[in-house]
Amino acid sequence: MAGHSQFKNIMHRKGRVDAVRSKVFGKLAREITVAAKLGVPDPAMNPRLRAAMLAARAENMPKDNIERAIKKATGGEGENYEEIRYEGYGPGGAALIVEAQTDNRNRTASDVRSAFTKAGGSLAETGAVSFMFDRVGLVAFDAKVADADAMLEAAIEAGADDVKSDESGHEVTCEHGALGEVAKALEARFGEPRRTALVWRPQNTVEVDDETGEKLIRLVEMIEDQDDVQNVFVNFAVSDALMARMQD
């Protein structure tokens, strides 16, 4: 699968997550707290909170950490985070969307801008690249839960728009407002998904050469290393050879 799926595989290459586990847990805890504050602290009634808890479990975040993050929201503890979207261009003109949660807008903007500049990219105005992407709901399952035909049939019945299946798994996409209902229907059929999220899906994926691809990957790593950054979405794809090298 091209686009964000391939990129996620790069960003979670062997050893990287382990090296920054505390940072990963911190970002997951922040999303859980924000989701619980914006909705209700019950994941059965709050699709965003459920998705955040699912992501935390996928990273083996301890149950105590998850419960503590929810209590911060219900007890009125912790900072009040503002959700901000940044858009920009990387080497080769590739488009990037950055989602952040911050208690200091100026600090976060400075950090993100610095990462773009150091990598030869540029931070742009809001709306500069988002028109190249679609905001969609994503529900992902391991390949073993069903064959491609069964997943397609179930996804259509659940109200999804598209399904992509290969040896790495199944990705079901839907209108962003329908994510909760689609995810619930598919979970009843196939069990808990490995990921449920709102994502920015590129309308077209740009193939880049290995030199440019490596620069872009480094750029996204620099951005993701910022504590306030939650997600990075891109519209480029790299060669299998480069992906293999970067995963070593």
From Swiss-Prot:
Record's keyword annotation contains Secreted: no
SUPFAM superfamilies given in the database record: YebC-like
Cellular component terms (Gene Ontology): cytosol
Keywords assigned by UniProt, alphabetized: Cytoplasm, DNA-binding, Transcription, Transcription regulation
Protein's cellular compartments: Cytoplasm
Superkingdom of the organism of origin: Bacteria
Keyword Transcription regulation appears in the UniProt entry: yes
TM regions (residue ranges): none
One matching Pfam family: TACO1_YebC_N
GO biological process, one term: regulation of DNA-templated transcription
InterPro entries associated with the record: Integrase-like_N, TACO1_YebC-like_2nd/3rd_dom, TACO1_YebC_N, Transcrip_reg_TACO1-like, Transcrip_reg_TACO1-like_dom3, YebC-like
Molecular function GO terms recorded: DNA binding
Family of the protein in this entry: Belongs to the TACO1 family.
UniProt-recorded name of the protein: Probable transcriptional regulatory protein M446_6579
Organism: Methylobacterium sp. (strain 4-46)
High-level lineage: Bacteria, Pseudomonadati, Pseudomonadota, Alphaproteobacteria, Hyphomicrobiales
